[in-house]
Amino acid sequence: MLIILVNGTAAWGCRLVSGRFALVPVRDLKTHEAAQPDRVRRVMKQMRSTGVVKKAIVVDSKSKVVLDGVHRLNALKSLGAVRVPAWLIDYSDDAVLVFSKDRKSQISKDSVVRAATLGPKFPPKSTRHMTKAKDGSLVPLSRIEAEISVPLSDLLRSH
């Protein structure tokens, strides 16, 4: 997969989703979905093994709701991280869409923010945040996230 970042914008045959990269304090982030403990443990093991975080989470810049990366966030929290690499985007942008897991029904962005701020959370892996490719097909935001290499040690309390 080829990802091009131009002035903080990711393009992958899609309408552009603008954003910026930042290290965000863990305490500021809110999740709208529950996490699967086994998956969190697998992600933790991989992060410990490599010593780096290879993919930023996707976060709404305004509400600080995690749109993609709940398991990565929970793994980082469990490892003692106080900062998380994040791709901050404007969730109100029409280019960002949210669907149910099966992609058959659209979910409102308001319900995602409500679940994160007031509860209850959605079940694990139940929402899919997408954008449209130039051909009209849906592309998960996770497919247009740039790979990164942030040392785990840079995110921990002791740093």
Regions found by a protein language model. Name each.
Residues 35, 49, 65-159:
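Basic- and aromatic-enriched surface patches that contact anionic nucleotides/nucleic acids
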Residues 2-62, 74-77, 81-89:
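Short alpha-helix boundary/capping and kink motifs at helix termini
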